[in-house]
Amino acid sequence: MVRDIVDDPLDEDDIALVKTYGLVPYSAPIKKVEKEIKELTEKINDLCGIKESDTGLAPLSKQMMQEGQPLQVGYVSCFRYIPIDLLMDIFSRVPAKSIARFRCVSKLWESILCRPDFKELFMTMSSIRPPLLLFTFQDDDGNLFFFSSPHPQIPCNENTSLVPTRYHVQHTTDSFSEIGSPLCGFICRRGKRNLDTMVICNPVTGESVSLPKVELKSINTETRPYLGYDPVRKQLKVLCIKSDDIPNTCDEHQVLTLENGNHLWRTIQCKPHYPKSDGICIDGILYYTAGFDMRARVSMVVCFDVRSEKFSFINIHVFMLMNDSCTLINYKGKLGALQFTCLSPKRLRFWVLVNAEKNIWTKCIYALPPLWNNLVQHTELAIVGMTDGGEVVLSQYCLIYAFYIYYFNLESKSLTRVQIQDVEMFKRTRVYTSLGYVENFKLM
């Protein structure tokens, strides 16, 4: 059973936690914590059949609200008879920002929310919730600013906007980084100058870990990291693909398992190829497009089995006209690909791999709606992916004046523009937009 939560002033370590999670100045965050705890208490009461009069819920005093006073939380006793496993189940259903605040309520709550089994449970619950949009802004110094938001309810009106949740800032030493697609709540980035150095970061916790440097054969050797997940063994791995200006020279690549802080690269063999796209992991298989070398066209989809660490290949015929701008997607559990046509009028090509062994793809071409020119105008857009509802998500490469994302429904041919608010400070900044982000409190 869990002991009572009583008035428990925070010591210096707790106040450091508060500052870490952005709860300064104290007055406004305390009100937010009080509101969030009250909402959490009501959920617990409903689950346990406890009346409000039985909880002994005491509000924070005005004295506590005065700025500069030590942060104290005076909630008592509604958790008296609730087992820890039930508390963890309840905590796992609230947003990550609330968890960050709840860790500062008392040492008891902090101990619960820091448990490895709670972090595993939170990750499981995040995975079954609707995935989030993740926005990563990169300033001129290379610093990364992370925001997330749920998708809007589609269809929505033309004035729809989203206010994203802001996470921690990642400070980098490289003025420009290549940002990979998120997986299991983590992101892998690689510096433009330091091609042998990769960093794994968690936007929610602000934690980042530099991986051991990979071995480069020459100064012309390039690297591209990918994240892959094995759902059977529940292992997250980093695959580092190497390529060179000289064709057919790099047949050794490296893979690393992210677990227990023991990060060691292992060498694996694969025929030389040059990656052309971001990767996507579907049921333990990591996919990305590639050519035979840097200057060659897209001629294959590389398939990497994350568990066995074996490669296979799907040939891309010339007549498919798949190019470097192609975006791979998860279409109802199958590999799909989206790409704009190069010729005017612009259209959208959509492929789905229906039989990998026989290399059979279906293909559709969609004309863009007349509203396209009015809403998009001269904005250069990237294909981000596809939602579970079948809408293609498009995003700006760079924030110029306002930041918009677009939803193109393939069935209705409708186009919806959604403004992302509170990011105006990142004007003329590179932005990476990703689908399928899940919040995660795990450490590496």
Swiss-Prot record:
Coiled coil: none annotated. InterPro entries: F-box-assoc_dom_typ3, F-box-assoc_interact_dom, F-box-like_dom_sf, F-box_dom. Residues 76-125 form the F-box domain. Disulfide bonds: none annotated. PANTHER family: (RAPE) HYPOTHETICAL PROTEIN (PTHR31111:SF59), BNAA05G37150D PROTEIN-RELATED (PTHR31111). This is F-box protein At1g53790. It comes from Arabidopsis thaliana (Mouse-ear cress).
